[in-house]
Amino acid sequence: MRCLALLVVTLLLFTATATTGASNGMNAAASGEAPDSISLAVRDDCCPDPACRQNHPEICPSR
């Protein structure tokens, strides 16, 4: 029974760590802080368009 409890706790910690890492990565991409090619492509495609820039101010820097 003790081994099962240890396994459950280990899986919960692993899941929490993986979820936190993914969440932080998404937040960085959404705020324009991630320098990866996907976020740059989205920003470059959206920011020149006034409607997209207005709907997504979190990815377009202020002018």
Curated annotation (Swiss-Prot):
It comes from Conus pulicarius. Belongs to the conotoxin A superfamily. One of its GO terms (molecular function) is acetylcholine receptor inhibitor activity. It comes from the Eukaryota. It holds the Pfam family Toxin_8. It is found in: Secreted. Keywords: Acetylcholine receptor inhibiting toxin, Disulfide bond, Ion channel impairing toxin, Neurotoxin, Postsynaptic neurotoxin, Secreted, Signal, Toxin. The cysteine framework is I (CC-C-C). Alpha4/7 pattern. Residues 48-50 are annotated as: Lacks the Ser-Xaa-Pro motif that is crucial for potent interaction with nAChR. One of its GO terms (cellular component) is extracellular region. This is Alpha-conotoxin-like PuSG1.2. Expressed by the salivary gland. Disulfide bonds join C46-C52, C47-C60. Residues 22-43 form a propeptide.
